[in-house]
Design a protein with these regions (language model features):
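Structural recognition of the beta-strand scaffold that forms the well-ordered cores
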Residues: 3-5, 12-13, 26, 113-124, ...
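Active-site-adjacent structural segments surrounding the nucleophilic cysteine of cysteine proteases
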Residues: 23-175
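Noncatalytic regulatory segments and standalone regulatory/sensor domains
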Residues: 1-3, 11-80, 247-253, 259-261, ...
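Active-site-adjacent substructure of cysteine-protease-like catalytic cores
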Residues: 1-8, 195-263, 267
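Solvent-exposed loop/turn segments at secondary-structure junctions
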Residues: 9-10, 20, 109, 120-121, ...
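Extracytoplasmic/periplasmic, Sec-exported soluble proteins
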Residues: 6, 106, 110-111, 115, ...
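A diffuse structural propensity rather than consistent per-protein peaks
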Residues: 138, 178-181, 203-205
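A domain-level signal for caspase-like cysteine endopeptidase catalytic cores
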Residues: 171-178, 185, 189
Length: 311
């Protein structure tokens, strides 16, 4: 795989093998790729490993197809079924969001946890509920800034919001990282007054229908060992259209086929770092490593879809 930095900002992850029938694996909105920074970026490494599994699967499939001798893959020529990014927040699990998140039995400030941040960003999208546990969620104040509130009232309100969600989803707090079980998020959604459907191994069509109806999706991926994982928000969609040229040297037969790539916009909950459009097939469980050479985040993909306030 190659990583391409763009002069205007942002970068792309692309396949280096023409047998992979997907010219783009990921399009990141902002920033640039720096190997010295990225080698410690678990989010990028998570996706890169999944993308490598997808590439191996595609190569195996290509070698078994149709008897064609050569193949040419175009770049993405257009997009269709585009749903622009729904959420406008770029939150992270540090200050001020974790101001009231404490390590049990201590006064040490903990990380807020990815589940609370992802859930909180969806609550902020709907500006609901108005209050809980005696805390007023001043949504206009909370949303006064993209990365964090610009007012003290907003910072206090969002810190209460994230702390309340953390208690409801039973977040286990730690100084360097915090975590919870994916199914615990149901507690926060139920208590805070939300409808939802919980699905394992969701299809890209389900994601598309949700964002088309202006419903962001909570999605999570867990490593096989179940010791690490991540929850984030999918809040946009686009089908990238490209073309494949086939040619058979023996028969002279050629064919040109239109293909589409389901690209989902991911808000990772890291202050905007890595946000962008990612090939959803990479998250699909059928593209787990066919050679079983190593463990990756290739199990326990699940999502909360059809999220909306009950009001």
């Amino acid at each position: 795989m190659y990583v391409v930095n763009y002069k205007q900002g942002g970068y792309a992850l692309v396949s280096a093998d023409k047998r992979v029938q997907a010219p783009i694996l990921a399009l990141i909105d902002k920033g640039c790729f720096n190997i010295n920074v990225t080698k410690n970026d678990s989010l990028f490494l998570f996706f890169a490993r999944k993308a490598a599994d997808y590439v191996r699967k595609e190569i195996t499939t290509y070698q078994d197809e149709n008897g064609f001798d050569s193949i040419g893959v175009s770049s993405i020529e257009k997009y269709k079924n585009v749903v622009n990014t729904l959420t406008k927040t770029l939150w992270t699990d540090g200050v001020p969001f974790n101001n009231y998140c404490k390590v049990s039995g201590t006064k040490k400030r903990a990380k807020a946890g990815c589940a609370a941040i992802a859930t909180g960003q969806i609550f902020a999208y709907y500006k609901y509920p108005a209050k809980y546990n005696g805390h007023d969620y001043l949504w206009n104040e909370i949303l006064s800034g993209e990365k964090q509130p610009t007012t003290e009232k907003g910072k206090t309100a969002v810190a209460y919001l994230i702390s309340d969600i953390g208690r409801l989803d039973k977040t286990r707090y730690g100084v360097s990282s915090s975590a919870t079980n994916v199914t615990n998020v149901k507690n926060a959604l139920n208590t805070m007054g939300y409808n939802y459907t919980y699905e394992q191994n969701p299809l890209s069509f389900v994601i598309y229908v949700n964002v088309l109806r202006s419903h962001p999706v909570l999605i999570s991926a867990t490593e096989k060992s179940k010791k690490t994982g991540h929850m984030w928000v999918i809040d946009g969609y686009a089908d990238g259209v490209y073309y494949i040229e086939y040619y058979n040297y023996n028969t002279g037969e050629s064919a040109r086929k239109e293909k589409t790539l389901p690209l989902v916009h991911c808000n990772w909950g890291w202050g905007g770092q890595g946000n962008g459009y990612y090939l959803f097939n990479v998250f699909d469980m059928q593209y787990s490593d066919p050679h079983k050479t190593r463990a990756t985040y290739n199990s326990n993909i699940s999502a909360y879809v059809n999220i909306s306030p009950k009001k």
